[in-house]
Amino acid sequence: MNLPTTNQKSAEYKVPSTESNKPQPRPQANVTKPTNASPIVNSIRRDTSWSVPATRPAPSGAAPMQWNLSIDFSNKNKPGTGRDAIDRTSIQRHQYNNRRPQKRDAGITSEAFLRHRDEVKQVRVQDFTKLIKKDEVPLRIIPLGGMEQVGINCTILEYKNDIIIIDAGIEFATPEMHGVDYMIPDINYLTKKKKNIRGILITHGHLDHIWALKHILPELDFPMIYVSPLSLGLIRKSMDEKDNKQLKYKIVDPDMDILKLGVFTVEIFRVNHNIPESMWFAIHSPKGLIVTAWDYKIDHTPAIDKPADIWKMSRIGQEWVRLFMGESTNAAKPGHSISEKIIGQNLDSIIRDCKKRIIVSTFASNIGRVMQLIDSAVKYNRVVFLAWRSMINNVKLCQELGYIKVPPQMIRPIGPDVEQMPDERIMIICTGSQGEEFSALVRMSTNTYKDFSLSPTDVVLLSSHTIPGNEKPVIDMINDLIHLKVEIIDDNDLDVHSSGHGKQEDIKMMMAMFKPEYYAPIYGDTFMRHANKKIAISMWISDENIMMPEENGQIIELYDNVVITSDKKIKLDIVMIDGKGQWHMSGEYVMKARGIMAEDGVVALIFKVDTKTKELVWNIQIESRGFVYSWEVKSIHTQIVEFARAKYNGNQKKWMDIKDNLRQIKEELGEFVAKIIGRVPMLMPMFVYINKDPKGIAGDITQDEAILGMTLEEQGYND
């Protein structure tokens, strides 16, 4: 471009008229729509109006002002559109903003806030109790789970006579917990205050957040739960018909709903996780704004869900966030979590290029991943066979809710017909990615799965990461698959799995967006939460403003001038679900007894006693299980019986109480067995009486009845 000289500019310059000074309308661009545009592009173009709401800083003492910036790309001449049209999203957000709680202190300035924070910090270091007003009632946050483990997510917020609960999940039992299915939160504290419960907020539908509801809701008289449609469906499937009829619920819309629960006002916003309809809560309370950031990842291109509501997050971040509670699962891992869209593209390319039968193993609860797999399978004309009940139930629920929209004949439970179709038309989606005993893939790897057998031409795709602690069963399963000569694809070959939890850079992004005064690393093992704490310190949150409860039950207290991790704790027990039974760990000897039997076996001895003479009237009978190898049984059994007979005959004139005699025989027998085999099994000496009712000798025991009802404590298992 040639710039004019000074003289040229002077000669050409004319003073513009007043009329020409008026703002001119921006010319409209005429965009010709390509005739060959893809359906994806067309669907994007249908949404022709963008709206960017924001909150302006308000003058001191004034309420915050709202404005909407709308950019219209639609055809001006089209009826009902153009510059005079009002964007529906703008209306919704305007209505939403009008219903929101106002800022806690709309007139506070940045300088005043910083000065207040520095004053509080100076006093707090010396003696934080000076910051607490006399007779001030704090808002109490009580974690019933999630502070010592990944699981049992359940947190209470309590202020005076109002309580809200966030989630109620489980933790699966460890191998050492013989016979236990899973553990649930101890709600003894809540049962005493169930009239104060204003509602239960559900973040998403994973088992570690909802599966305990079927146990605790009846005990709490079925308080209202606030839940998304998918989470509600998963909750209903976990409950029996009777409890389903009593279930009280409200389906919430994160884009529009604001809940009033006692003194708490709750805003809801969308986040991304590996299950659709995940939510966070911004809780306005008498002690400030609390943001609860349970399971999440920052995914700008999610596969099947809407992106996280960054607009609402940033707007809330402009307010004074008193406390931010953020999950810690991936806090020790650097970087960002990979987008589910990338995982979906990689899976799609594998399915497209593979001409063999494909078996994919993933979590049944990873509904987003399962939906991507089904879409790709149908795209390449593969029939999807589902293996295992949890996988079948979850897919059926997603079909009912409209998340999965494929021809019904393309999805079916696995059966004999799977062997009758061409390999290139088959995909099997199954459980077992963690090597769980009796899971579908584990049974397939050992050729014990009904109606289906793996062959050397199959491809097994492991779309998951190994959870810490599951390494051994996963390796065993992979070894079995290798023996079957199948091809294995896992995350080491290609990105076929992404965690549903944010990593370090995701956590930093949330801290920068919300700018909390106090921070509480939650949900994870101790090392995870400490890694989260280090991130908070790197983001300029001072150490004394980071709340780190050491264990479940330790209380976080919010006062007007300070937030503290209190020394106060509520006593919590480990509540275990064992089949249809529910029992507490403390005071129970079941787990110890199961451990002894699992490690060392069990030996039972039956003494038949004449109650008049106290003499043995028959040979001592002995039975054992898991005790010694078959070639040793006869020899060791004989030694034990002879020792037991000698001890009984030597003591029979002395004992007055049968329980004392049982304890003495058990103790001496244990020492003897330890000498001959080097370990002590569970020993169960039992007496059977003949000739006389022994009432008065051993209590109310009927004739010819063995003492089988003695507790483990009475048998000496109380050490």
What residues fall within each predicted segment?
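Hard-cation-handling environments
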Residues: 332-463, 467-492, 496-515, 520-655, ...
